[in-house]
Structures are given as structure tokens and as C-alpha cells.
Amino acid sequence: MNKAYYIGLMSGTSMDGVDAVLVDFAGEQPQLIATHTEAIPSHLLKGLQRLCLPGNDEINRLGRLDRSVGKLFALAVNNLLAKAQIAKEDIIAIGSHGQTVRHMPNLEVGFTLQIGDPNTIATETGIDVIADFRRKDIALGGQGAPLVPAFHQQTFAQVGKKRVILNIGGIANITYLTGNREEVLGFDTGPGNTLIDAWIQQVKNEPYDKDGEWAASGNTDQQLLAQLLSHPYFSLAYPKSTGRELFNQAWLEQQLSEFNQLDEEDIQSTLLDLTCHSIARDILKLAPVGELFVCGGGAFNTELMQRLAALLPDYHIDTTSALGVDPKWAEGIAFAWLAMRHNLGLPANLPAVTGASREAVLGGRFSAK
């Protein structure tokens, strides 16, 4: 059988590395051939975190970081291909998500901005790059996010089976597959790992709470949890999407100002419950019973998975491994899939999910020639 190799590149709101995946789309189901994570150097990470906050001299910083992130993404591709021992000539295209530095779709003139110059990726890898997937959807009146539900529908939908696919990155999003292949819902539920990562980084200088152990050692403060859950985002009707613009360290500090007496591990436990409760509430609104399959970094947080199970007693819960897709690489595979859709001239957004006025071919092509 002929191969249909595409590469997917993803760096999410967690900014915990660039995931690069090599996927073969020749068969009915995507086949994961090789994977690689490229660490984000600390100087680049600091620059990106600064750019995500309001500040001065942003245009110079944006321009420099756009190129630097492009070079980092290209390095991820070249290392992936070296590891897989596959020639660049065998790759049809790279699908690059880029690094989101602003996502503000609800302004009068909404916009989203991802950096990681695709021209740089194309020239440094010698492979055509398909990128800028979100802005066409926004131009059509949509949120530009989440985009993964279209991939979830194609890969995980089964006639007659109600399934929820939960992707927990920095932000969490859900896809509700109703059992009718044509019908799908999806939206961002709110914070995934972003606040629990930010708090442990601030207090313990650790990148993330492994297995949720620190959160498990604390006790949730119900008053703080109720205050956090009163954020207006949680009561918005979908389609909706969010990011660091709403849920960030500055917002967290503001929320904690009246809770100085709390132990640090109790705050961590409360933040984990914010993630779990906001996800569970939205899932229960869609269907009281069903199957839940989890992917993204959150799938590996044992405490998070246990708390979700307790909040969703009538759900059968597993990771997407049970459906044949490695939960760690699911989002990277989705962006390889988006590149494949663009290459074939096929639409890749779901208006019922994003609120766009119509389906559209997403992204632009940046030639390596």
C-alpha cells in the first residue's frame, strides 16, 4: 500500500514542549509511525510567557519569537525524521499549529494569533508546511477553536454509541459524539492543566504536579472552589473557547487574595477540582451516562482521573488508547490530519462546534521550494 505520510506539530497553552508526530493516513485509521518532543529552551519559554501578558515593545518581541519558534519547530521535525530514519521527500506536508500568544475571538473584531513562522519551518526542513488553521474559521464568524472535534468525529465516532472525547491540555475541551455520525458538539470547558501547572511552578519550581500527588496531599477549600466556578465563562452557552487570556496567573492571584490562610497544597487541590468540576458539569449537561475517553497531558494525572471518575459515576472512563490513539500524541495527530484535509481540499471545521457560518478548508500552504 502507498504511504501517506504527514507530520503534525503542536505546542499547547501548557508550553511544555513541541510535540512532533509522523502519521500515515493511507489506511482507514491514522497510523502513528514516530514521535518526538522538542524541549522549549528556557530563554524562549520566558519570552513566550512574557508575550502572553500585556506589555510594551511587543511587536519586536513578537517578530523575534515568531522566527525563533519557527526554528524550534523545524528542529523538532528534523529530529523526528532522523529518529524515524525517513527521508523528507517521503513527507507530503507538515501541519503546524504554532504557539498561541493571543486568542480573543469574542471582540467586536475577533482574532487569534499563533506564532512559529511556517516559512522558516518549510525552508529549514525542505517540506511544505500547512499552517494558520484557526483564522479562516474566525473570518467566517467562528471561534477558531476547538478544531480537534472534527478529527475526533472522523476517528472515534461510532453509530449508536454516545461518546465524549476529553482533551486535557492547558485548556480542556470536549467533543460529544452523539452516535449519529453527522452530529457532533464540542467546546472548551475551561482550565485543564494551566492553573495547576502555574501554581506548582510558582510555589515549588516544578514543571507539573506528577500524578496529581501534591493536589492529593491537600484538601479542597469549598468556598474558594465556589468562587472560582463563578467565573462567567463557565455559564456561557457554547460555541465557546478560551485560553490564558482568561485563566492565568494574574487572575489566580486576584482570586487568592482573600484566601491567604490556605495551605499551598490545599490551593492545588482546589485548582484540580476546578478543572474536574467544570469538565464534569459540562459533560453531565450533554448526557448523564455514556463513555468518556481522555487524551492530552491530563490523561496521565492519576488524581485528576480518579476525581473525574467520582464526579461521573455513570460513565465508563478510559483513555483514547482504548480506541487506538495514544493519548499523549492525539493532538499532534490531529494537526497532521488537518494538513491532510487541506492537501486534499477538504473542509476541517465544524460550524456546530466553532460557530462559523460554513465549513471551510483551513490553513495556508507555505512551499519549501
From Swiss-Prot:
Keywords: ATP-binding, Carbohydrate metabolism, Kinase, Nucleotide-binding, Transferase. Signal peptide: none annotated. GO terms for molecular function: ATP binding; kinase activity; phosphotransferase activity, alcohol group as acceptor. Pfam families: AnmK (PF03702). It is an enzyme of class 2 (transferase). Its EC number is 2.7.1.170. GO terms for biological process: 1,6-anhydro-N-acetyl-beta-muramic acid catabolic process; amino sugar metabolic process; peptidoglycan turnover. CDD domains: ASKHA_NBD_ANMK (cd24050). It comes from the Bacteria. Pathway: Amino-sugar metabolism; 1,6-anhydro-N-acetylmuramate degradation; Cell wall biogenesis; peptidoglycan recycling. It catalyses: 1,6-anhydro-N-acetyl-beta-muramate + ATP + H2O = N-acetyl-D-muramate 6-phosphate + ADP + H(+). The keyword Lipid biosynthesis does not apply. ATP binds at G12, T13, S14, M15, D16, G17, V18, D19. Belongs to the anhydro-N-acetylmuramic acid kinase family. PANTHER family: ANHYDRO-N-ACETYLMURAMIC ACID KINASE (PTHR30605:SF0). Catalyzes the specific phosphorylation of 1,6-anhydro-N-acetylmuramic acid (anhMurNAc) with the simultaneous cleavage of the 1,6-anhydro ring, generating MurNAc-6-P. Is required for the utilization of anhMurNAc either imported from the medium or derived from its own cell wall murein, and thus plays a role in cell wall recycling. This is Anhydro-N-acetylmuramic acid kinase. It comes from Shewanella sp. (strain MR-4). The gene is anmK.
